[in-house]
Amino acid sequence: YGIIGFHLDRGSIKKDAVKLQEEIASLNNNRVKFWNENAADKEVMLSKMEEIKTILDNGKVKLLMHSIAFGSTTNFFNPTPVRQRQMDMTQHVMAHCLIYWTQTLLENNLLIAGSRILGLTSEGSYKAMEGYGPVGVAKASLEAVVRQIGWELGSKGITANTIQAGITPTRALTKISKDWEDWVERTKKRNPMKRVTTP
């Protein structure tokens, strides 16, 4: 399968993203295209649609994966109360933009029977935790978005689901809490295989 993706990386992290893109290209005969742009931005999405269609060359999107880990990691109240624009941004980026991507791909006849839509969720969708207020709300919203997509598009043979892979030691995890390493260790203890998901 070819892979089309977006990432939003700056500075030294950008080099890691380029390296990963090269690794992926070496595995799938160079059938890969990534843009270092904000996938949650409507203008970016619309501006890439014609290029996506050209890359697909009359093909269709087999899998739409929503894996955007960018939101406000704070509490609702103390010590740093969340602001409305932070909540709105987190909701849009981590949940609502999947609706607009799905709509746009449908409008461009790029999703068909057999297409799959996946979103990555977390236990924060049903469990309160330090510094996870806005993201937890967004994860619960993402699950509701995916349920509704599945209900509306199921008759077209398009399925939608979320995956809760558990604690995964990524750069995004380190931004959520200074105690992220403790989270990883606790997760290993309760996992029968004594491990966590690897990125």
Briefly describe each language-model feature range:
Residues 65, 118, 160-163, 173:
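Hydrophobic structural elements of the Rossmann-like NAD(P)H-binding subdomain
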